[in-house]
Amino acid sequence: MTENEQIFWNRVLELAQSQLKQATYEFFVHDARLLKVDKHIATIYLDQMKELFWEKNLKDVILTAGFEVYNAQISVDYVFEEDLMIEQNQTKINQKPKQQALNSLPTVTSDLNSKYSFENFIQGDENRWAVAASIAVANTPGTTYNPLFIWGGPGLGKTHLLNAIGNSVLLENPNARIKYITAENFINEFVIHIRLDTMDELKEKFRNLDLLLIDDIQSLAKKTLSGTQEEFFNTFNALHNNNKQIVLTSDRTPDHLNDLEDRLVTRFKWGLTVNITPPDFETRVAILTNKIQEYNFIFPQDTIEYLAGQFDSNVRDLEGALKDISLVANFKQIDTITVDIAAEAIRARKQDGPKMTVIPIEEIQAQVGKFYGVTVKEIKATKRTQNIVLARQVAMFLAREMTDNSLPKIGKEFGGRDHSTVLHAYNKIKNMISQDESLRIEIETIKNKIK
């Protein structure tokens, strides 16, 4: 990369980071690469699904950086992984395989879902370690963390990561013997082979894999069928002894897999255990920003933030909400999804879901004011003495954390402030909490009083 290209690209990244939320930047921009700038055309490598976002949101960024560095209008040519792989794949055709061919082994269908990749997995603080471990395993299967055990509640991305690992390994080594399977289906296959008296086929199928991806391993603990856990134990040992990678997911930690044999639990803890927790507000906004690219509707920012505030337990609820909205919008022939339209569309889903305690913003303001010795009137006003500013920002932080109100709505309740003011207060307090233990305790104390 030439010096001008480096300056240009650094400026693009700087402008993008200043305009986007951190989680959105991490997902859509962080992994993009500038390949070259030639004849006023910037060739940028990125994941294909992110092209539309760049076209919609970053065109001005590229134009600005172009005029600053080259004093010219820079257009963009996006290239994708598939384009870069053509030459590499052609080279691989003429190369000898690194491992001995296994033509004598039965064919294995991977059952991977090709739509899941690391590129379209939204990262946040709640899943960062799980993603890092998954990428490490995909890069060097059988050597880094074996087994890798990922646990967390439903709809948080465990299945996505399993498939992303498999797809990444398959892209690098098309001859790899990979199997994605749920524990329930493993049990079903075991039963079928027992009945047909073809257990040797099952053993040959699973014990000669390069990568075994087992989803919802807790299902194995529920089964009392004689021999099921024994067969999985032997499969695990055969693979692990041959340095073949095993990745498992569960809705609980290995130690809480009741009715599972101790020797299996022990083996599950040989490698690395990582947890995924529900996405925070910023990550939910980033997830929605990504998902709405699949729909031909306009989602204003306040609608996205409203939806992010409505569902905080898992990603599936967010995806389901978008499908509900799409149905209503198509029926009404609406292009722009307002907060009112979104609220109408998800009403039934909210009624079916867990009931949330509605916390008035006024209650938050009152409790914060009482704690810091200021009035609600002062919190809503413009006075900027230190104790009032802190109370105001803490109240805004808690209003965003503890209610499903959009940023504009919260701002309105704080003397008609702009949504950007609320966002600034939220980010500032969030950052302060990470560095100031006493402030974190203060806010937890206020939270407990509000609840």
Curated annotation (Swiss-Prot):
One family name in Pfam for this protein: Bac_DnaA_C
Region of interest (Domain IV, binds dsDNA), ranges: 330-451
Quaternary structure (record): Oligomerizes as a right-handed, spiral filament on DNA at oriC.
Name of the protein in question: Chromosomal replication initiator protein DnaA
Native source organism of the sequence: Streptococcus pyogenes serotype M1
Family as reported in the entry's similarity comment: Belongs to the DnaA family.
Swiss-Prot/TrEMBL keywords: ATP-binding, Cytoplasm, DNA replication, DNA-binding, Lipid-binding, Nucleotide-binding
Family annotation (InterPro entries): AAA+_ATPase, Chromosome_initiator_DnaA, Chromosome_initiator_DnaA-like, Chromosome_initiator_DnaA_CS, DnaA_C, DnaA_dom, P-loop_NTPase, Trp_repressor/repl_initiator
Spans annotated as Domain III, AAA+ region: 111-329
CDD domains: AAA, Bac_DnaA_C
Cellular localisation: Cytoplasm
